[in-house]
Amino acid sequence: MKRMTAKKRLLVVFIAAVAVGATVALVFIFQFFGDAVRERSDLYISARTDYPGLLDSLRPRTDHHWAFDRYAGRLELERSFKPGHYVLEPGMNVVEIARMLKLGMQTPVRVTLNYARTRAFLASRLARQLDADSAELMRALTDPQLAREVGTDSLQLFSLFIPNTYEFYWTVSPEDFVRRMRKEYDRFWTCLLYTSPSPRDLSTS
């Protein structure tokens, strides 16, 4: 009888241990792979943002902070996160979020160029839409070496910026922004050339 009681106690302890282990495993899985984002939001991490600043921006938008800290530590995210514009979608888990920040899987932003009277005004407008500040943008817009690189001079560089809406990575450098606008300028005029009627077409119409 005593022997049976001991066996029952051992069985109860075993079942309890299994139950506790299963509960811990479920909590662990939920923390790391459960939904950490409840609603869509845009996360902007500047190149001037440090890791505490990243966490300050991220925490109000997500749950499961303990799990994020554990996984981020494993990825050494504090030393390797990439700045950028990131979209947090409902249903994302902390593993996906941490990997997104480590790999720099940012979402482009729409940059709208309107008619600008001066380069200073253009730099100011762009600084509201990109991570670069107006001083950095102004240096690129007046850089004679960069102007020569894109086939113009510092006085004519301003004319490359055709009013339209473009997609850029939020962290694009001012220099790469200018290089891209040169390509957009060439694309615009090439398209216009091939879609405009020729003098022969006009004479026969």
Locate each region found by the language model.
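Conserved catalytic or metal-liganding residues and their short signature motifs at active sites
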Residues: K2-S196, R200
